[in-house]
Amino acid sequence: MKVKELTVEYGNRTIIENLSMQAEFGEIIGFVAPNGTGKTTFFNAISGLIPKKNGNISLNKIDYNSRGATYLKELFFLESSKNLYDYLTPKEHLEYIKAAWKSNSDIEHIFEQLKMKEYQNRTIKKLSLGMKQHVLLAMYLASDATILLLDEPFNG
């Protein structure tokens, strides 16, 4: 992932100004800062959920300006348990992700790897917070995305 001189504004307020960074495959980067300083805004801008004012973003040499399926398939953005639907099962969540990302992942293998087979058919509403976090990780694995963005992964 490569970000060069990223600027993001809300109205007349600049939230991110001229941010540049680069992350190589396999590298883990953390942003530690007080609430309200732009961490979520950064993830939203990279994901194309909000517009950027200036700057260049590329994921695995795929340009942000395309923001098509190829760009978005490289990225998986998790915001705590906001990505989960209470009345679906973990298995249904993974099947949806696999279809949306056109992934070749083996859902049964993912459940085995994460020791989730016993609760793959329970509704999300009936799962503990720890189990829900396992479901989020499983969703990422099912996507085949190469970049994982975690917003407040230890929240809750």
Indicate residue ranges for each PLM-predicted region.
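Conserved structural motif at the start of ABC-family nucleotide-binding domains
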Residues: M1-V3, I16-E17
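The feature captures the beta-strand-to-loop junction immediately N-terminal to the Walker
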Residues: V32-P34
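Helix-to-loop junction immediately C-terminal to a conserved catalytic motif
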Residues: S47
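Conserved ABC transporter NBD signature motif
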Residues: K52-S66, T70-Y71
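Q-loop/switch helix immediately C-terminal to the Walker
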Residues: S81, D86-K102
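Conserved ABC ATPase "signature" region
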Residues: E95, A99, S105-Q120
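Catalytic Walker B motif of ABC-type/P-loop ATPase nucleotide-binding domains
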Residues: L148-E152
